[in-house]
UniProtKB/Swiss-Prot annotation:
The gene is rpmA. InterPro entries: Ribosomal_bL27, Ribosomal_bL27_CS. PANTHER family: LARGE RIBOSOMAL SUBUNIT PROTEIN BL27M (PTHR15893:SF0), RIBOSOMAL PROTEIN L27 (PTHR15893). Residues 1-10 have a biased composition (Gly residues). The keyword Ribonucleoprotein applies. This is Large ribosomal subunit protein bL27.
Amino acid sequence: MAQKKGGGSTRNGRDSQPKMLGVKAYGGQMVSAGSIIVRQRGTRFHAGTNVGMGRDHTLFALVDGTISFDVKGASNRKTVFVTPV
């Protein structure tokens, strides 16, 4: 017979690193070119004028200006714009 108990095992004990997603700059706020506006998975927000989209769907400002959010179209698509100053 075994003189020691067998070691227990667990199937939990893992967690993923936080991804820091969300809106980083809000409507009416001034941004400089290259500033990140939204970090997202998929296109919850779409790029409007003067806004670019990175390969991970991050939205960023292409020019210095003021941010505005708008709901466009029949599908109520949320779009982000930057109005140059």
